[in-house]
């Protein structure tokens, strides 16, 4: 493998910045960025906008008017080698006689996974791998998990007081956190493929659970290709079929999957389209709640890559107790609600300190008067 230089890192960072634009629209594909460099100058830039659209390499080649002979291509993910909705990028780079390809991450997709690099090397093109690999893998962490297993990446968001409460005793919760935190939540929603919530949240808050793009900070909004804006699938866990779908706002726009629990094997997995917005499905129970593993595998079959959980204590606790939570976004305000407030969590007791579930603090950031604590599960 060629020596990784500061120059390689500099140009790969530019490719990663481009890739971040695709996090909002590239579903179910990974977010990929590419820059093409000749004589130390960038001559082409591109990122993958949406499934079925040209890949990042092709966008950058177009930007360079396909005049790239002898150039170096920096791309955040291994160039594809198979015919899907678009032709293989590796073959196009070979055809146009680029001199060198620098990649951040290998593609774990079995359809690619090393085959793109082989095409390039067999053509005499120099290949350098794993430049800023850690950053690239984290950027596409949802894709990396979901493409190699049956379960999507799960992000759990909690807004809470300084003393770990999500609401007053009477359920009042608007607003524990400030407007800047809520803007950031819109950004997380916009990067998610579905949002899961529970029946109690729907009844208490009557939320829309939609991405309010007009509330995104300009630095986020300007990245998005407005042509491909989308709304995540909304998944509501209504174990006992208690919700009246004509009463709540969440059922009046976008796509909603309403999940009911059942012990009847004949009902299990059956779906019914209720109207243009709502589909009902029956899923098995585990400990009197919807079986989360069954639910997540079902969503994985829909090619859902990233799940966001925005719910109350019961569902939030269930995701953490189950071990399916890959990351936690804890938005903590300076408010103190007191001992009678509703707890953010009601977790199982650890058997011992050396056997307890543990999350690693990835990042902290201040949003107005609030602080975001971003934790990753121990396996990430």
Where are these regions (language model features)?
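Proteins enriched for Cys/Gly/acidic motifs involved in redox and nucleic-acid/cofactor modification
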Residues: 24-26, 52, 117, 131-159
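N-terminal glycine-rich anion-binding loops that anchor highly charged ligand groups
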Residues: 26-40
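Enzymes that bind and transform nitrogen-containing heteroaromatic metabolites
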Residues: 2-13, 18-23, 27-30, 45, ...
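Zn2+-dependent cytidine deaminase-like catalytic core
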Residues: 36-135, 252, 262, 320
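Alpha-helix capping at helix-to-loop junctions
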Residues: 122-126, 145, 149, 198
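Short alpha-helix boundary/capping motifs
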Residues: 64, 121, 147-149, 327, ...
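Short capping loops/turns at secondary-structure boundaries
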Residues: 109, 113, 129-132, 147-151, ...
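Short low-complexity, flexible loop/linker segments enriched in glycine and/or proline
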Residues: 116-118, 142-145, 211-213, 324
């Amino acid at each position: 493998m060629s020596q990784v230089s500061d120059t390689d890192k500099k140009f790969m960072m530019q490719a990663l910045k481009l890739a971040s634009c695709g996090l909002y629209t590239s579903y179910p594909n990974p977010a990929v960025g590419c820059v093409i460099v000749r004589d130390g100058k960038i001559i082409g830039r591109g990122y993958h906008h949406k499934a079925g659209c040209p890949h990042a390499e092709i966008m950058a080649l177009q930007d360079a008017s396909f005049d790239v002979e002898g150039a170096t291509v920096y791309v955040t993910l291994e160039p594809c080698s198979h015919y899907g909705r678009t032709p293989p990028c590796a073959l196009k780079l070979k055809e146009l006689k680029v001199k060198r390809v620098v990649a951040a991450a290998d593609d774990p997709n079995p359809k690619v996974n090393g085959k793109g690099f082989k095409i390039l090397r067999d053509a005499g093109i120099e290949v350098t791998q794993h430049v800023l690999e850690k950053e690239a893998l984290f950027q596409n962490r949802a894709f990396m998990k979901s493409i190699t297993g049956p379960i999507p990446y799960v992000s759990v968001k909690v807004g809470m007081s300084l003393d770990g409460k999500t609401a007053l005793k009477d359920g009042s919760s608007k607003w524990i956190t400030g407007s800047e935190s809520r803007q950031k939540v819109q950004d997380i929603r916009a990067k998610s493929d579905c949002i899961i919530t529970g029946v109690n949240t729907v009844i208490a808050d009557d939320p829309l659970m939609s991405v309010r793009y007009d509330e995104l900070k300009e630095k986020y909004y300007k990245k998005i290709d407005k042509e491909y804006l989308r709304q995540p699938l909304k998944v509501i866990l209504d174990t006992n079929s208690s919700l009246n779908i004509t009463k709540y706002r969440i059922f009046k726009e976008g796509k909603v999957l309403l999940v009911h629990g059942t012990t009847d094997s004949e009902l299990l997995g059956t779906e019914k389209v209720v109207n243009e917005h709502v589909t009902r499905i029956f899923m098995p129970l585990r400990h009197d709640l919807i079986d989360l593993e069954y639910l997540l595998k079902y969503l994985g079959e829909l090619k859902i890559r990233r799940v966001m959980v925005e719910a109350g204590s019961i569902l939030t606790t269930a995701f953490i107790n189950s071990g399916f939570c890959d990351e936690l976004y804890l938005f903590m305000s300076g408010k103190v609600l007191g001992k009678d407030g509703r707890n953010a969590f009601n977790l199982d007791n650890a058997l011992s300190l050396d056997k307890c579930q543990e999350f690693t603090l990835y990042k902290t950031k201040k949003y107005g008067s609030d602080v975001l604590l971003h934790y990753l599960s121990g396996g990430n």
